[in-house]
Amino acid sequence: MGCAQGKCCVPRRQRGRGGGGAVGGRGGATLGRVAVPGAGLVLEYATLAVAGLYPDSPGRESQDAHLVATRFAGHPDLHLFAVFDGHGACGAACAGFARDALPRLLAGVGVGAGEEGGGRMVVVEDPAAAFREALPAANAEMHAADEVDDSMSGTTAVAALVAGGALHVANVGDSRAVAGVWREGRVAAEELSWDQTPFRADERARVKACGARVMSVEQVEGVRDPEAESWVADEGDPPRVWARDGLYPGTAFTRSLGDQAAEAVGVIAEPEVKSVEITPAHLFFVVASDGVFEFLSSQDVVDMVAAYEDPREACSAIAAESYKLWLEHENRTDDITIIIVHIRDSENVDKFLYRKRIPSAGSCCCAMAVVLALQSVRHAPVANPLGAVARVFLRAPAD
């Protein structure tokens, strides 16, 4: 969910609808593997990025960015996975800037000549502290960069760093990270980040203390009581952050990188960081943009990942289901970026045998067709692009 100058600010019930769907298939996802020798783990990871469908802007550039940096900073036990969701007129540039800046700044925190000439890397000794310094530094660099106009544009950032036997997640904004944890015979969702939006009472109070108004678009327009704080998440008209005497910035989040004009009303780049010990019960984790979580809960996503042995299949299943739900509720889809990381060791690998099904060849082909259709209608002069995508969904073979 973006800002008033970026992603849609029209309440959801006033928007159009699309049609049906199916899940499954690899759909262009990429696969990689890397060892974590200090913890005896192997990470098997997949990434998938699909640009959103905006009928009024065919060929629109995706504003998401992501990175995978294995053996981060030259350390065999450090592996970084991050997603950035840009917003505003320069959202793509902001997301790309953050993607490029974060690894450099994170690796550089605390580096200097030691007593014996060696460098001290905080990211190795205290990853959470390194994140708390690097993300605000990326924000400051973005403000100063001539090539990026972040006055009314910016990006979220959610980054997961595997550091030996621990997982450290830093979040700024409303992208999300979640782990799948084996508990009592099932895979449960463990939140690794918390969406920073005005729905949260603590974040709402913080920005109000900085002089912000917190209202939905309909409250600003006088359709609803401006004093009411009874927003419903699935209504599609979320509370937003506004200047006291202006119709800006209109952000549906309370923290971000960039958004220089919003800083005066409390939209900050300070991350929240969660650190967890990786146990044999931790089967995988997911890092994704809010294009995934707009209509899917964290448990929904975890259930879908758990149903597929190949993380590429899971990426495409989640993307296809997310697109289906977007088209059922709106006349567009958001950009979607997903990183899935399986955590393998000798103790937890057998737990993957509980999976509900193996995707059929038909479902694999279906998801690939969905992704390819979405990409093709974005760039082709189709009279009804949403209808074209819906036809692909409706032709999907049943498992």
From Swiss-Prot:
<comment type="similarity">
    <text>Belongs to the PP2C family.</text>
</comment>
<feature type="binding site">
    <location>
        <position position="85"/>
    </location>
    <ligand>
        <name>Mn(2+) 2</name>
    </ligand>
</feature>
<dbReference type="InterPro" id="IPR000222">
    <property type="entry name" value="PP2C_BS"/>
</dbReference>
<dbReference type="GO" id="GO:0004722">
    <property type="term" value="F:protein serine/threonine phosphatase activity"/>
</dbReference>
<protein>
    <recommendedName>
        <fullName>Probable protein phosphatase 2C 65</fullName>
        <ecNumber>3.1.3.16</ecNumber>
    </recommendedName>
</protein>
<keyword id="KW-0378">Hydrolase</keyword>
<dbReference type="GO" id="GO:0007165">
    <property type="term" value="P:signal transduction"/>
</dbReference>
<keyword id="KW-0479">Metal-binding</keyword>
<keyword id="KW-0464">Manganese</keyword>
<feature type="domain" description="PPM-type phosphatase">
    <location>
        <begin position="47"/>
        <end position="343"/>
    </location>
</feature>
<dbReference type="InterPro" id="IPR036457">
    <property type="entry name" value="PPM-type-like_dom_sf"/>
</dbReference>
<keyword id="KW-0460">Magnesium</keyword>
<feature type="binding site">
    <location>
        <position position="334"/>
    </location>
    <ligand>
        <name>Mn(2+) 2</name>
    </ligand>
</feature>
<keyword id="KW-0904">Protein phosphatase</keyword>
<feature type="binding site">
    <location>
        <position position="85"/>
    </location>
    <ligand>
        <name>Mn(2+) 1</name>
    </ligand>
</feature>
<dbReference type="InterPro" id="IPR015655">
    <property type="entry name" value="PP2C"/>
</dbReference>
<feature type="binding site">
    <location>
        <position position="86"/>
    </location>
    <ligand>
        <name>Mn(2+) 1</name>
    </ligand>
</feature>
<dbReference type="InterPro" id="IPR001932">
    <property type="entry name" value="PPM-type_phosphatase-like_dom"/>
</dbReference>
<dbReference type="GO" id="GO:0046872">
    <property type="term" value="F:metal ion binding"/>
</dbReference>
<feature type="binding site">
    <location>
        <position position="290"/>
    </location>
    <ligand>
        <name>Mn(2+) 2</name>
    </ligand>
</feature>
<dbReference type="Pfam" id="PF00481">
    <property type="entry name" value="PP2C"/>
</dbReference>
